[in-house]
């Protein structure tokens, strides 16, 4: 009888051990996003988190932190790069100084329009940019829209390059943007996105440049009522993951996470298109003075030295720039 009990206990222990060995401990990730609730990126990143949990069968959960509550964008990029955060929704502008291949999208007028950007990023150019990002420890899972950036300020309409002369213009922290404003005769003021409203209100800067949804959602239109449709930059955003975190996943979960990101990108692009229209309508009703720019070639010509200087310093990137420009 005692031997039978011992045998049964042994079988029970083996069964428990076997069960425990098949238990998968859920991974809990944290994700960063600068935008407020309701913004297309915020809605899409929440959908991404939902899809990650669903597609991995609960093996991975993602908690999103919106409105930049975990820090500013350059710091968050660094945190994802070193593994302090797993996920981030980043604009490629602040990432460019760290990843030269990603920086080419910050060259003024490199994209003709949104469709051109989509085709370039969804093709060979996007693959090269992704490879450049992986060199610094970041994997691009999917590309989000970020619209076309135009100038706005509190002083006057901008119709021609010389209208920027003397204006203090906030830019993201990237030498390409500072060079762009300097080429127009303006005074670039790199600063964090969260500081722009107060800086516009108090006159620390005269203007900035961004897309319609950001201009509206931040309230910048309340303190800088002149919006001039220069569309000088079309900078994509990415859903990014730390490379070590991504490479530690099973093939099944790698596929699941990438699928989740790309499905969220489809949602984000659709939401972005609608939000751009509604944001424009809202600020126009609020009394913003809007103007088209009939001669954008004058701006292209004035900003050409930015291209020349950057590619002279980075000749290895000339083929990538040509690839983007020649994307049909």
What are the residue ranges of the model-derived segments?
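N-terminal secretory/targeting leader peptides
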Residues: 9, 26-116, 124-328
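Bacterial N-terminal signal peptides
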Residues: 10-19
């Amino acid at each position: 009888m005692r031997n039978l009990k011992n045998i049964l206990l042994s079988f029970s222990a083996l069964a428990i051990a076997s069960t425990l060995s098949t238990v998968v401990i859920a991974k809990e990730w944290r994700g960063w996003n600068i935008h407020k609730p309701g913004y297309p990126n915020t809605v899409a990143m929440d959908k991404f988190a939902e899809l990650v949990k669903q597609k991995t069968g609960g093996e991975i959960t993602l908690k999103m932190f919106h409105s930049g509550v975990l820090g500013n964008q350059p710091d968050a990029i660094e945190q994802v790069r070193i593994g302090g955060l797993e996920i981030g929704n980043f604009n490629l502008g602040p990432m460019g100084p760290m990843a030269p291949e990603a920086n080419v999208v910050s060259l003024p007028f490199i994209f003709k329009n949104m469709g051109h950007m989509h085709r370039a990023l969804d093709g060979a150019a996007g693959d090269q940019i992704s490879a450049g990002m992986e060199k610094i420890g970041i994997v691009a899972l999917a590309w989000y829209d970020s619209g076309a950036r135009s100038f706005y300020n509190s002083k006057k309409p901008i119709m021609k390059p010389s209208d920027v002369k003397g204006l203090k213009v906030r830019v993201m922290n990237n030498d390409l943007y500072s060079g762009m404003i300097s080429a127009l005769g303006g005074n670039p003021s790199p600063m964090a996105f969260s500081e722009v409203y107060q800086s516009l209100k108090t006159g620390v800067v005269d203007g900035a440049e961004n897309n319609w949804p950001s201009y509206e959602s931040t309230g910048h239109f309340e303190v800088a009522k002149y919006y001039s449709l220069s569309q000088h930059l079309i900078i994509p955003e990415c859903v990014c993951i730390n490379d070590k975190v991504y490479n530690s996943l099973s093939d099944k979960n790698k596929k699941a996470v990438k699928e989740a990101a790309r499905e969220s990108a489809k949602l984000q692009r659709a939401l972005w298109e609608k939000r751009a229209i509604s944001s424009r309508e809202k600020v126009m009703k609020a009394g913003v003075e809007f103007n088209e720019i009939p001669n954008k070639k004058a701006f292209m010509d004035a900003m050409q030295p930015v291209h020349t200087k950057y590619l002279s310093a980075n000749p290895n990137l000339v083929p990538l720039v040509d690839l983007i420009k020649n994307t049909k």
